[in-house]
Amino acid sequence: MKRKPSTEATAAWIRLMRVQSRVLDCVEQDLKKAGFPPLAWYDALLELSRAPSGEMRPVELERQMLIPQYSTSRLIDRLVDEGLAARRECKIDKRGQFVEITETGRELQKKMWGAYSAAIEKHVGSKLSDADAIKLCGLLDRLGCSCGEAPTLAARDGAPAR
């Protein structure tokens, strides 16, 4: 017999979904006010910049992105149109493509981090002590989130961690 979630578990789920949506909306608004493109652009540029060669196959990029991106090909088209990324044909598999970050893309990603990090502090960091943030990461880890990577990635990249 399958067990139904408790009232408390259901309430936690609802809060988690609402808070995630609201915080993302606030971060998006802060980026827009600062004159930057959407967070998905930053996310894609960050992942491309983290790739050892600065390039990835589109499917790899989609898997790595922090924000679910259901129209990765359209996002890549926009990044290419703006000169932030370029497409490159795969020499081994002529049907395959790579997307690589351009120097302009690297510059934008670094500039966006200033506004993005301020938004993270405003909407998350200022509301949680470091001890609370560690506890929250532990709880999210139990749900399958990878918050355990945060210190390593943040220290390495000076960029938002997962």
Language-model regions, residue ranges each:
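N-terminal leader segment of winged-helix/HTH proteins
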Residues: M1-A34, R162
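C-terminal regulatory/oligomerization modules of transcriptional regulators
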Residues: M1-P5, D130-R162
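N-terminal positioning helix adjacent to the helix-turn-helix/winged-helix DNA-binding module
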Residues: E8, A12, A40-W41, T104, ...
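N-terminal helix-turn-helix DNA-binding core of bacterial DNA-binding proteins
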Residues: C26-P68, T152-D157
